[in-house]
């Protein structure tokens, strides 16, 4: 089955609306580059977190077959709720909207996991309170593509990100994001918490599919 070229379809629109983007390998979580007829890993993708995407980049990437689209986090923040319990996931989404604002940008990959998108008042690095992760500078999340586990397209059930401007998203600070993540972590049953020593630590260079 042929995967749509999301970059060709939506890349320029997202950039015009203020989103920093990067190419994602087909049916993958990974940023990629297309060279000599094949996709390869993109080692320096995190540089896109620190600057706007250029028109020339979008033109080049749009010719790469079956390219997905990632959002380079930093000025845009992803709140990743990596929870497969329907009730807990919905509860944490509600908490995020109370703490951080009622964002219209909610992305579903493997339901009931979900990711909420916000605008950073000032760019900041991401951090984890597993299974909650705040994705910031040096990280990315998938906006459009085929989820590698479900084989289905990522869904935006409220409003598609390509229909929004960055300015439409509620602005948040690192302090607000940390307060939310700490409160959300308390709501997660012990059985759903991964055994990890990284609670509250910065998470740099992450690749997230959701």
Show which residues each predicted segment covers.
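Conserved phosphate/metal-binding and DNA-contacting active-site motifs used
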Residues: 1-209
């Amino acid at each position: 089955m042929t995967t749509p070229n999301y970059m060709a379809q939506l890349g320029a629109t997202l950039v015009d609306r203020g989103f920093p983007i990067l190419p994602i390998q087909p049916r993958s979580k990974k940023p990629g580059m297309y060279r000599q007829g094949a996709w390869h890993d993109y080692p320096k993708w995190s540089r896109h977190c620190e600057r706007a995407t250029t028109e020339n980049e979008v033109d080049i990437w749009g010719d790469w077959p079956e390219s997905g689209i990632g959002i380079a986090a930093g000025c845009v923040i992803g709140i990743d709720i990596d929870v497969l319990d329907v009730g807990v996931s919905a509860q944490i989404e509600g908490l995020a909207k109370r703490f951080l604002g009622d964002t219209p940008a909610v992305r579903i990959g493997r339901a009931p996991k979900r990711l909420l998108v916000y605008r950073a008042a000032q760019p900041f690095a991401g951090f984890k309170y597993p299974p909650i992760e705040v994705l910031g500078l040096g990280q990315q999340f998938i906006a459009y593509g085929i989820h590698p586990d479900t084989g289905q397209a990522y869904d935006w059930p409220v409003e598609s990100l390509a229909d929004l401007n960055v300015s439409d998203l509620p602005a948040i600070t690192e302090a607000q994001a940390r307060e939310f993540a700490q409160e959300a972590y308390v709501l997660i049953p012990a059985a759903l918490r991964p055994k990890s020593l990284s609670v509250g630590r910065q998470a740099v260079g992450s690749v997230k599919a959701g």
